[in-house]
Amino acid sequence: MLESVGHLQQVAAQWRFNPEDVLLIALNACGARSPLAKPRMRFRLRLDSRPDEPLFLILALGRADSPFELDENELRLAGEKVGEIEGIEDDDAVLGYWRRGRRMLTLNSNARSQCTGCVFCPNTLEDASDPKIRALDLAGYLGTLAANSGMTDLTGVETVTVCTGCFLREDLALEHLAEVRSAMGANGCTGTLHFLSSVLTTEEGLDAAARLGPFHLTLTAECFTGRPQILKESKAKLSPEAMVAVLGEAKERGITTDFTYIVGLDPIEEAIEHLKRFVPVTTTFPRFQTYQAHNAFMDIYRTPGSETIEWHLTMRRSLEGLFEDTGLRPAWWQNYRSPWCFTFAGEDLTGERV
């Protein structure tokens, strides 16, 4: 994908993209070789070209064919240092973690072992804990998390995200979301309740979600081709038309809407043909994520051509064409596998990247 730092600079100049974004796309797509004995790690990266702008990544390791190499101190491309590594740790299933300077809280508050899984999901590769917080524990857990983070309560938290994909039915998801909202209120948080899922789909369910207060639904679309082979059943059974309808119904109820999509699973033409129908029902920038193949088995699901950097830059430019006029813009702190970190359609992207 990238052969050297010189190749990186050549590609960036040819496509008129900043080289840092090109590097990050390739890094997420290729993973890295590493002496660290874990399949997946999270860490802060300071690129040598932008040392004062740290960013956060979660990356597949153990890719012997990657041009990137990572250890506890450095990131190298074809043997040449391109960045420094800080705070590396195993990407296990922590119960909760902060983004955006402790204004955004992500919860893994439901047991992940209930999830049958999608082929691109790294959870089955991890010796991770399997957290599940009982309803009576949620308020106490949030209070403890605040105290351990030097906060008296959660009044300053703008969003609490429930990101586990392990709810078998809509009613079970809504029951848990109501418990999370109650626990938020007990700790002074009146912010947005954000849910990533494919099970919240009915009009009755969306009505119930809207009644929970400020609500944000991220529908886990993921891909459009080969859905039965790639996705778990609850996701695969939703057609693209059905997903657009769900987001439209949610938008009508005042719910913030977007979706997740894995870049690298669909051919570009088919992806764009479907995605253009999502634009009118999307109210915040979607989570476009570069496909991370953690092993050779996962490689077989890449769409032909996506093993090249040129394919990814073509896709990025096509996606920019869909969303440039909407005013919606990506933020790296929301999505550490984004095709955009520092620029979008020639515009500088500002704000936190951790």
Task: Give the positions of each predicted feature.
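Conserved C-terminal portion of the radical SAM core fold
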Residues: 216-218, 240-299, 313-331
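Canonical Radical SAM [4Fe-4S] cluster-binding loop centered on the CxxxCxxC motif
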Residues: 99-137
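A short acidic, amphipathic alpha-helical/loop segment
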Residues: 204-209, 273-277
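Flexible glycine/acidic-rich beta-alpha junction loops that bind and position SAM and/or redox cofactors
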Residues: 226-234, 263-269, 285-311, 331-349
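Short, charged beta->alpha transition segments
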Residues: 93-94, 105-110, 141-151
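Core AdoMet radical
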Residues: 122-205, 214-243, 257-260, 285-289
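Non-catalytic positions within long, well-ordered alpha-helices that form the structural scaffold/packing
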Residues: 153, 210-211, 279-280
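Flexible, acidic/Gly-rich N-terminal and inter-domain linker regions that tether
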Residues: 1-104
